[in-house]
Amino acid sequence: MAAQYGSMSFNPSTPGASYGPGRQEPRNSQLRIVLVGKTGAGKSATGNSILGRKVFHSGTAAKSITKKCEKRSSSWKETELVVVDTPGIFDTEVPNAETSKEIIRCILLTSPGPHALLLVVPLGRYTEEEHKATEKILKMFGERARSFMILIFTRKDDLGDTNLHDYLREAPEDIQDLMDIFGDRYCALNNKATGAEQEAQRAQLLGLIQRVVRENKEGCYTNRMYQRAEEEIQKQTQAMQELHRVELEREKARIREEYEEKIRKLEDKVEQEKRKKQMEKKLAEQEAHYAVRQQRARTEVESKDGILELIMTALQIASFILLRLFAED
């Protein structure tokens, strides 16, 4: 990320910044995927193809249908696929402040970092605006994110009988330049496909993503901003878990007081034992309920009002520190 909020990037060049494979904990059973590209490139439809069902709203429109970063998930081979669809924040006319806010939202939704960054480009006429948006994306993520990036060509169905490799050999120079950057890390999709064709291309893409993950030693893309955001999320999660612990102890004390008062008033030993068992059952139910809440504390934190502002504040503080570092160099 750049040092200043409002012109933020994923490409900090500060001394000591950490890039490349990051720890997958606490989400080591997840495969986190981010879709980026210009408005109308087919990001939402690609997300639906990856997840195997229609969960993102997609369609043909001059303006972005997706208004802010959205996260959806599904299961695949005992792995949770987490896909984040981004709006047209990388379009050249979008203000940097708006881009920055959605980048922070993307960080929140994919922390501690994505395993794959999918650059979505439609096949066909590659306009100057599309080229500029692509350049903005590549610059924003930086050279060191390239090993996590995959090029996705949408509208494969527009090729008709033309072979993809034949098309790419005759493609415009800008597309050829992209191919030089991504090498064999590319895939073409027909997002209108159904049945066997849909499953086959889904398996091909997920296989490519798995290959990228292996090549990056099972790690995820990270940088100082992701690390700072993850620290804030974990801090808030621990605070939430402590709150749940206090609530549980308070509720258990209330239950004990209620039942012990009733037990004291009983003279029948059998009735006393019956009430004790009822109390123990009630306590066990509360412990089970709060155990689930503890496990879901992170999700609760990520979805609560105000967390985006907390992350923004944390990253702005980090940005201030980075600015000081630049000034001292």
From Swiss-Prot:
Keywords carried by this UniProt record: Coiled coil, Cytoplasm, GTP-binding, Nucleotide-binding, Phosphoprotein
Question: Polar residues: which segments have biased composition?
Answer: 1-16
Q: Where is this region: G4?
A: 154-157
The UniProt annotation puts the region (G2) at 64-68
Its annotated compartments are: Cytoplasm, Cytosol
Pfam families given in the database record: AIG1
> Where are the annotated segments for Disordered?
1-26
Q: Which residues form a coiled coil?
A: 188-300
| PTM annotation | Phosphorylated at very low levels in resting splenocytes. Rapidly and transiently phosphorylated in response to splenocyte activation.
Map out region (G1) in residue numbers. 37-44
Sequence similarity: Belongs to the TRAFAC class TrmE-Era-EngA-EngB-Septin-like GTPase superfamily. AIG1/Toc34/Toc159-like paraseptin GTPase family. IAN subfamily.
Protein's name according to its UniProt entry: GTPase IMAP family member 4
Organism of derivation: Homo sapiens
Q: Which gene encodes it?
A: GIMAP4
